[in-house]
Amino acid sequence: MSHFKEIKNKSSDVNDRNLGDEWIDWNGKDEDVIKVGKGLFLLFSLGVILISDLFLVVLIYMISPRLVTYFEELPSAAWIMVFLYVLITTFWYLELLITTYREKNFFFFKSRPHFHFEWLYIKVVKLATLFGVSKDNIGNSFVKVSNAISKATKKPNKSEKVLVLLPRCLTKTELKKIMDFKQIYPIEVCTVSGGELARKKVKEIKPTAVIGVACERDLVAGIRDVGGNFSVIGIPNIRPNGPCKDTNVDLEELEDTIKFYVGDPKNQSGPVVD
């Protein structure tokens, strides 16, 4: 495990940095080191699905007496629709669960389920907030689930064009080490100051895959924005001095992700394909 996991954050000053749009409300309070897994997002996802199923059951139960006044068979038809909805959502959740933990594509429709995933994220954040779970914790777990799905649904591509997007808040030492990867791997590396510039770079370079390094908030926004167009893997940065200043990244994780797309230069067999 990377030594970065042991870093503890220090007190920080709001005025000594240029905060990104996602951190405008930050008050300088120390951040806790985020240590959550995929299970947090999946647990609240299950909660969202169960609540939606229960809501429909209660709704149809309450309006059935009125439905029968319009057409005698209408309540039966409504219950059949509810049953099918529950069956589909249960089956889809099982697909999501198995795909995430096995990192193999178990979805009936093999493409990345971006639309359903997007709908689920919005509901999960609302539910998690009610239970006092921070947006950053949910975001971190969401990114890990999204990464697993990206790996599982990745299609073989011998001419992979990988774009690595970096935040400008990385330390110079860290940035230099990442730039050195360009001498080893066939990748494009760009530093961007925000989502608008990131989208501009994506349109300009037209990659087949994107590796993003950023805080959870920016990663979630980016995945939701372009995750349905091509493969995206996000790597949360490490913020020993708070957000948007002298951040780090797990270089081992970043290099492993690059190898996932373009392969290991020591291995001429090509990119890693599940």
Report each predicted region and the residues it spans.
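Short helix-loop-beta junction
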Residues: 178-188
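A short, well-structured beta->alpha microelement
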Residues: 149, 186-201
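Short, charged, surface-exposed secondary-structure boundary motifs
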Residues: 201, 220-225, 241-248
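Short, acidic/turn-prone active-site loops that include or flank metal/cofactor-
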Residues: 195, 214-218, 236-241
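N-terminal topogenic membrane-targeting module
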Residues: 20, 76-177
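Ser/Thr/Gly-rich flexible loops in soluble cytosolic domains mediating phosphotransfer, phosphorylation
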Residues: 232-270
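Long terminal accessory regions outside catalytic cores
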Residues: 1-93
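Proline-aspartate-enriched helix->loop->beta-strand connector
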Residues: 206-208
